[in-house]
């Protein structure tokens, strides 16, 4: 069955939202502060109107195709924030994604990770709107003050940046779908026209012949180079031509480590800030020109194949080099990689043009597992888009012995049958294998490295997102009817019980059940207890 038209989704969503306003307005006699999060009671009513999940999926489909500025989406977001969508960072009740740089980003994260009923909560401490200060090498023309006092000029610049950051990834995402003439496109000509109108409003001060440029204050040299590129473009340019332009940009990736917490999946806007504001190339894919090569090698190829030809002037082909590369990573990271047309085009290019073939291997000796038609390729690309190392694709040979599937892909699709554990009768024991390693390894690493270890936290996050069921899908309950303050404390208890030959599984949290609710301090005690027991066990075996 084909996807419903954009107008049908809009009509359906308006019907769904009809009772929303009065329901939330009756919550309390005193008027809540505009822009503040809903109370738990208000959220129960709010989510009740988005239940069952197909209703939430409908709103997500609309958000994905129209963006956060669609009037119906704006109305929905206003309901969730007492009439005013906040401008700046927000916090959530998700244990491993506790804050986001905008409410739009938070909403998109809920949709892309299928955690439809995650709640916005009050932040325990102020969070800066842009996290560029966390990058030591960042050389931004605008300094972000550590205090709350800013000059009117600085405030205006920050507001402009925030506006462009919110709109830019949405435009890129639509552009890549438009470029590839996706059969998965949900909007058609009517949506494209509406989206271009939104872009025109945001860039009303720009010359009409320069609509593809963004209000980010790029240097004059880059603007001139961009104009020269546009002059050379012809109507028959293909996806390969665009990728070749990315290769000619000669992007080089630095080797200094970056904070792992600022990953593309949880912080796309901070990532775009790095690409837009830093003169040095972003740390994304080492030696990207080796993957993409130059346009001269591809000009004569596949001209006969209409599937790879774009009939639209502009779009992604007119973006600057860095953005053209970023859109590929953004597209596969913020959507389900195995279903995106950009991933299919990228895979085709590497297999046929660059001669890598069907098998996917990297320079770490790993052979990415083809659990589905695009799984192996997406596993590699998601790792490359997030990688802090010089990760490159290689021709597969006998040296690539380690079977591997990226946890980033597992978190996206939740369909890796050989990795994901079984979920029966509302219970979930955990992932059978993560990163090629079984639960015993991860329990040991949790005991020795703690919850904050990068690899441990990635394992915990993937497992947490692998099971969302019950009346409170973001809460963590087990088969002993204990409710945990976070997933790490539950996993510590599960590892402890496993060591004692007792099986404890995660169980859906139900409204009509009674649970022993643990405090955060009790949760920390469980983590410490497992660490101590593991240390004792290790000493007794090897001491």
Curated annotation (Swiss-Prot):
UniProt region (Pro-ACR binding), positions on chain: 26-106, 319-427
Signal peptide region: 1-25
Residue span(s) of the pro-peptide: 26-276
Domain of life from the UniProt record: Eukaryota
Record keywords, A-Z: Cytoplasmic vesicle, Phosphoprotein, Secreted, Signal
Localization (cell): Secreted; Cytoplasmic vesicle, Secretory vesicle, Acrosome
Pfam families assigned: PBP_sp32 (PF07222)
Main subcellular localisation: secreted
One Gene Ontology cellular component: acrosomal vesicle
Post-translational modification summary for this protein: The N-terminus is blocked.
TM region(s), chain numbering: none
GO biological process per UniProt: acrosome assembly; fertilization; spermatid development
Basic and acidic residues bias spans: 193-216
Segments of this protein annotated with the region Disordered: 187-239
Tissue: Specifically expressed in testis.
PANTHER family named in the record: ACROSIN-BINDING PROTEIN
Protein name, per record: Acrosin-binding protein
Biological classification of the source: Eukaryota, Metazoa, Chordata, Craniata, Vertebrata
């Amino acid at each position: 069955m084909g996807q419903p038209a954009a107008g049908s989704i809009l009509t359906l969503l308006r019907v769904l939202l009809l009772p929303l306003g009065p329901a939330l307005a009756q919550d309390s006699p005193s008027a809540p502060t505009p822009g503040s999060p809903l109370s738990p009671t208000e959220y129960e009513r709010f989510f009740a109107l988005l239940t069952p999940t197909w209703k939430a999926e409908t709103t997500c489909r609309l958000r994905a195709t129209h963006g956060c500025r669609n009037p119906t989406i704006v109305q929905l977001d206003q309901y969730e924030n007492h009439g005013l969508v906040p401008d700046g960072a927000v916090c959530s009740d998700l244990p491993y994604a506790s804050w986001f740089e905008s409410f739009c980003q938070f909403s998109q994260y809920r949709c892309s990770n299928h955690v439809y009923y995650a709640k916005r909560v009050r932040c325990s401490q102020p969070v800066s709107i842009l996290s560029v200060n966390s990058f030591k090498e960042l050389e931004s023309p605008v300094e972000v003050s550590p205090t709350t006092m800013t000059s009117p000029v600085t405030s205006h610049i920050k507001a402009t940046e925030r506006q462009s950051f919110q709109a830019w990834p949405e435009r890129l995402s639509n552009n890549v779908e438009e470029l590839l003439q996706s059969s998965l496109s949900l909007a058609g000509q009517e949506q494209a026209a509406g989206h271009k109108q939104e872009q025109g409003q945001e860039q009303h001060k720009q010359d009409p012949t320069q609509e593809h440029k963004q209000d980010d204050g790029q240097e004059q040299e880059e603007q001139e180079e961009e104009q020269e590129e546009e002059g050379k473009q012809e109507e028959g340019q293909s996806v390969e031509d665009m990728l070749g332009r990315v290769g000619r940009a000669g992007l080089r990736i630095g080797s200094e480590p970056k904070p792992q917490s600022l990953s593309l999946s949880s912080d796309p806007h901070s990532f775009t800030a790095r690409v837009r504001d830093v003169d040095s190339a972003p740390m994304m894919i080492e030696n990207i020109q080796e993957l993409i090569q130059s346009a001269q090698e591809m000009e004569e190829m596949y001209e006969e194949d209409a599937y790879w030809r774009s009939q639209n002037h502009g779009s992604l082909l007119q973006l600057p080099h860095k953005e053209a590369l970023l859109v590929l990573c953004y597209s596969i990271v913020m959507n389900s990689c195995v279903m995106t047309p950009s991933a299919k085009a990228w895979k085709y290019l590497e297999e046929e043009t660059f001669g890598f073939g069907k098998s996917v291997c990297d320079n770490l000796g790993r052979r990415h597992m083809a659990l589905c038609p695009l799984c192996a390729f997406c596993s590699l690309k998601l790792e490359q888009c997030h990688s802090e190392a010089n990760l490159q694709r290689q021709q597969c040979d006998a040296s690539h012995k380690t079977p591997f599937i990226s946890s980033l892909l597992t978190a996206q699709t939740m369909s890796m049958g050989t990795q994901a554990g079984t979920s029966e009768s509302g219970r979930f024991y955990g992932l059978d294998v993560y990163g090629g390693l079984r639960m015993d390894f991860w329990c040991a690493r949790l005991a020795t490295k703690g919850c904050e270890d990068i690899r441990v936290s990635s394992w915990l996050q993937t497992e947490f997102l692998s099971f969302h069921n019950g009346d409170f899908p973001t809460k963590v309950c087990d088969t002993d009817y204990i409710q945990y303050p976070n997933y790490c404390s539950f996993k510590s208890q599960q590892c402890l019980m496993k060591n004692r030959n007792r099986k404890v599984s995660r169980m859906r949290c139900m409204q009509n059940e009674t649970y022993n609710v643990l405090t955060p301090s009790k949760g920390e005690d469980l983590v410490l207890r497992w660490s101590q027991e593991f240390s004792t066990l290790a000493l007794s075996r090897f001491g």
